[in-house]
A protein has these predicted regions:
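Structural preference for solvent-exposed beta-strand-turn elements
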Residues: 1-212
Length: 212
């Protein structure tokens, strides 16, 4: 992480009033100097859910409102959790998704159920699909619509994958994944899977290499 370029994050947090030292350095370690008067901003989101979540959390601690305008759908765990439990956030859905955060509000503590990671489940799913006469049940996996592109793509190409015992908690859908080995057609992924299967592309490449 120390080698990762944080320029986008630094620029955004600077708009809230934060200061980073030394200046013109965009990777960690950095010294962060907070401000006593953080002011909400308007932010046009890209596909990075991490940057969007950073803006949401910074907006919670800023005066006034912070607006996030989202043209492309990205992972939405943070806003799902907040809108379910607090009145500090509003979401308008249309051609563009607009998230508005009202900062400096008191937040009550809550209990959160965190389901299993679908990206981790993808590796065990691949192992089962590629081994003859194999079956697997993975319990309590997050099935958020922005996270299941890997499974949707494989099902489209013949993989025997089923979601069962589906339920909802804190605005998050989760359930059990049932996998049975079998023949998979050659994979072809359109651009709509880009954000929904970003982390799973390496294992998809392996599956594609081993299918007939």
């Amino acid at each position: 992480l120390n080698k990762r370029n944080m320029k986008k994050l630094i620029v955004i947090m600077s708009e809230f009033g934060a200061e980073f030292l030394p200046k013109n350095k965009f990777n960690f370690p950095l010294k962060l100097i907070s401000t006593e008067m953080p002011i909400g901003i308007n932010y046009k989101a890209g596909v990075s859910a991490q940057l969007k979540s950073a803006v949401i959390l910074a907006g919670l601690n800023s005066f006034g409102s912070t607006k996030i305008i989202e043209d492309e759908k990205s992972r939405d765990h943070t806003e799902n959790m907040l809108i379910k439990n607090f009145k500090t956030i509003k979401i308008k859905r249309g051609k563009k998704k607009i998230i508005e955060i009202f900062g400096k509000k008191y937040l009550n503590s809550i209990n959160i159920n965190v389901p299993g990671d679908p990206s981790s489940a993808a590796f065990f799913t691949a192992l089962t699909l590629l081994n003859k006469n194999s079956s697997l049940k993975i319990k309590n996996v997050g099935l958020n619509s922005t996270r299941v592109g890997f499974f949707q793509l494989l099902k489209k190409h013949g993989a025997n994958i089923k979601f069962k015992n589906i339920r909802k908690d804190n605005n998050e859908i989760y359930g059990d994944i049932y996998v049975t080995s079998g023949k998979i057609k050659p994979l072809k992924a359109s651009s709509k899977y880009y954000t929904k299967a970003t982390d799973e592309y390496p294992i998809l490449f392996i599956i594609a290499a081993l299918t007939q």
